[in-house]
Amino acid sequence: MMICYSPITTCSRNAISIKRHLGSRLYGVVAHGSSKFSCYSLLSGLSRRHYTGFRVSVSNRPSSWHDKGLFGSVLINRPTVAPKEKLEVSFLSPEANMKCSKIESNMRNLYCYSRFAYTGVIVSLLVCYSSTSQSAYADSSRDKDANNVHHHSSDGKFHNGKRVYTDYSIIGIPGDGRCLFRSVAHGFCLRSGKLAPGEKMQRELADELRTRVADEFIQRRQETEWFVEGDFDTYVRQIRDPHVWGGEPELFMASHVLQMPITVYMKDDKAGGLISIAEYGQEYGKDDPIRVLYHGFGHYDALLLHESKASIPKSKL
């Protein structure tokens, strides 16, 4: 089975997930599988069944636009020095109750493209499965109560050079297609010193944030069109739909619309806690970002880490 990288891709069931980390940023994931749930590309924000490859180009030109509306400005800023790269492979298959017993992974081609060069990885995987009775992850189709808070607490530590967060609370977000925008809007309110929004207010804020993010795509078309998969106008039109999932481009845009940093976390069973996998908008500060938890199958929840907080900059709301 030959699998090519596709930018930030997830699949809800029977999935093989390959993650490529550049430094502390999760830069690419590929998922492939078949079930009643579609494979989903976070970079495109659209539901698709199969992926055969991808291309990435990186702009070194920072640009900014300011808006006097509810949310702030957007600034593209990419590092020019490529950080250390790491390849991870994980397997998700709860209904089939399968686990991976053997993996042979061979790098076939690796070549880079950053606006002038091309980035791609082709990986050959030989996968042998054996049965197990344990489920790999929770069902993404569940619809959580926005006030459903789950608290986890223990001492912090490090794993493979990354900090592991073990004292945290997960704020359940409904899986209605708005979960990314709901999670960011929820975190925005808390970071701004406001009360946690109720379900109705959370939905309204999420839809407003989605609209502003889509508007920024249009306003900054020359700088954003390169990382939108497929037709740009179609992509923007579809991302305005309140039930279409958002992903990495929307998180990237949201950080600049809000002028606040956003950090994405995932659970790491080997580490025994949460680790950060992506960071956006760090030019607005690195302390106390908006935090969201990504579950690896297309769903986001709001996240609180219980640690001493640094001073919080003024909101642009």
UniProtKB/Swiss-Prot annotation:
Coiled coil: none annotated. Its EC number is 3.4.19.12. Residues 168-306 form the OTU domain. Gene3D superfamilies: 3.90.70.80. It comes from the Eukaryota. Optimum pH is 7. Hydrolase that can remove conjugated ubiquitin from proteins in vitro and may therefore play an important regulatory role at the level of protein turnover by preventing degradation. Cysteine protease with a preference for 'Lys-63' over 'Lys-48'-linked over 'Met-1' ubiquitin (UB) tetramers (e.g. Ub3 and Ub4) as substrates. Also cleaves RUB-GST fusion. Belongs to the peptidase C65 family. This is OVARIAN TUMOR DOMAIN-containing deubiquitinating enzyme 4. It comes from Arabidopsis thaliana.
